[in-house]
């Protein structure tokens, strides 16, 4: 009884540890990596691969304010690319957009009711000055109404793999600022929300698919409709741009956001040499607990410093890396009984400077490509047969990617194996038959002794 009780107690102690290991968030950071950020949530990723470098409360659903406009930008660039609209296409200002544009509490370029503006003018006002009425104008152009545009936002969010999002308008404003004309089906005090991880994933796709967005987001200031009576100075709210008060080397985007719900938030991107990072901070505050422009940019600076100073881009596995115990896979009915497997390319990723030589890979076979543990001949060279998950030699967690996938690379066959002819198959069958008899015989003889 005493022995059984000890076993039960041991199991009860082990289970919580296992549960914590199994369900630990891939972006979670250890205590020694605590950056002391005063934010509700934050995340730092490699803009090229989506690899998570740091995370704090990144899965919590929070207000995102004008960072919502990154989705509007994505849908605009997609429409331009597909030829559905053009940069020089004109938009006629609606009563709704006009009313919002006249609200001096908001970031806006004042629009004249019934006046025509090009899509390029509206986009630059959005990207540089976070102009809300201009954003509504783009939404109405793309979908006919902001109500219909929200459906486009939802569909694209699902397609891009965003999680736990809710869009109620195109701008990120609280609906109470929309002059009673907020989109149908949304509440008068509703606001867009999303986890920091989804914000980072949206920024990742925006930069991957439409890097030209940086041409506008990197502009510190510009005059809207220069040379006309409607001219107005547009100062970029991203004060980390070169020449601005909180400038940071390499910053060229991306989007700020400020509401009571979202606080002072920011999605920034910076590039140094061949490394580009994306940082997201939600509801940043100072040491007194007050939100401010400085607080959000200080938090972003800490993230960028951590990424650029602590990580290096290194080749951690060569293209000819051999999987110990899995150098080849068996092939059924082939001219050869097995086929060599390997990586498609060297594995290069951002790693801690001190950890460059501490990584290896675990081969995970794609069972859908196999039958009873074997590949079926013929097998083409370059056939995908599974994934190689990157693992740390010391057992430390390897951050996954912002889209939820593990750090991995494709594993393929390194040669072709043709299907054996009937004569070869017959010889193989005979050989297997006698090999089986030999194994049984030797086993019987060993049993005698």
Feature map (PLM): residue ranges:
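Sec-dependent N-terminal signal peptides of Gram-positive bacterial secreted proteins and lipoproteins
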Residues: 2-30
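Short alpha-helical segments used as structural interaction elements across diverse proteins
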Residues: 3-4, 66, 296
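N-terminal pre-first-transmembrane soluble regions of secretory-pathway and organelle membrane proteins
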Residues: 7, 21, 25, 39-40, ...
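Generic detector of short alpha-helix boundary/capping microenvironments
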Residues: 19, 37-38, 60-61, 102, ...
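Active-site-adjacent loops and short helices of periplasmic peptidoglycan-processing enzymes
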Residues: 26-197, 207-210
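Domain-terminus/edge residues, biased toward the C-terminal soluble/receptor-binding domains
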Residues: 179-180, 187-193, 197-449
């Amino acid at each position: 009884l005493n022995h059984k009780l000890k076993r039960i107690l041991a199991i009860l102690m082990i289970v919580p540890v296992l549960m914590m290991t199994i369900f630990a968030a891939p972006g979670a950071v250890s205590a020694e990596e605590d950056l002391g950020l005063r934010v509700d949530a934050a995340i730092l990723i490699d803009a090229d691969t989506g690899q998570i470098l740091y995370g704090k409360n990144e899965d919590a659903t929070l207000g995102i304010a004008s960072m919502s406009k990154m989705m509007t930008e994505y849908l605009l660039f997609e429409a331009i690319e597909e030829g559905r609209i053009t940069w020089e296409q004109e938009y006629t200002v609606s009563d709704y957009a006009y009313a919002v544009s006249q609200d001096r509490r908001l970031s806006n370029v004042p629009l004249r009711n019934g006046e025509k503006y090009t899509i390029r003018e509206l986009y630059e006002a959005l990207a540089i000055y976070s102009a809300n009425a201009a954003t509504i104008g783009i939404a109405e152009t793309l979908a006919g109404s902001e109500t219909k545009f929200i459906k486009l936002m939802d569909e694209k969010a699902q397609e891009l793999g965003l999680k736990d999002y809710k869009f109620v308008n195109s701008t990120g404003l609280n609906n109470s600022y929309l002059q009673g004309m907020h989109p149908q089906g949304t509440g008068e005090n509703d606001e867009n929300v999303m986890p920091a991880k989804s914000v980072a994933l949206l920024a990742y796709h925006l930069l991957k698919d439409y890097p030209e967005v940086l041409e506008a987001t990197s502009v510190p200031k510009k005059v809207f409709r220069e040379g006309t009576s409607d001219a107005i100075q547009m100062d970029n709210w991203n004060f980390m741009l070169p020449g601005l008060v909180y400038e940071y080397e390499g910053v060229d985007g991306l989007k700020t956001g400020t509401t009571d719900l979202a606080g002072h938030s920011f999605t920034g991107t910076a590039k140094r040499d061949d490394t580009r990072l994306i940082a997201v901070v939600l509801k940043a505050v100072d040491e007194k607990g007050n939100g401010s422009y400085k607080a959000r940019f200080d938090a972003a600076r800490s993230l960028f410093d951590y990424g650029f100073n602590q990580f290096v881009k290194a080749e951690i596995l060569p293209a000819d890396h051999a999987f110990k115990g899995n150098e080849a896979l068996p092939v059924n009915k082939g001219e050869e009984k097995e086929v060599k497997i390997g990586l498609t390319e060297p594995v290069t990723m951002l790693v801690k400077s001190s950890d460059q030589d501490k990584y290896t890979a675990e081969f995970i076979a794609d069972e859908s490509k196999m039958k009873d543990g074997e590949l079926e001949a013929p097998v083409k060279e370059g056939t995908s047969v599974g994934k190689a998950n990157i693992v740390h030699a010391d057992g430390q967690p390897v951050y996954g990617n912002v889209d939820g996938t593990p750090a991995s690379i494709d594993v393929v066959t390194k040669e072709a194996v043709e299907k054996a002819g009937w004569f070869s198959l017959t010889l193989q069958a005979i050989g297997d038959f006698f090999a089986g008899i030999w194994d049984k015989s030797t086993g019987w003889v060993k049993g005698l002794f």
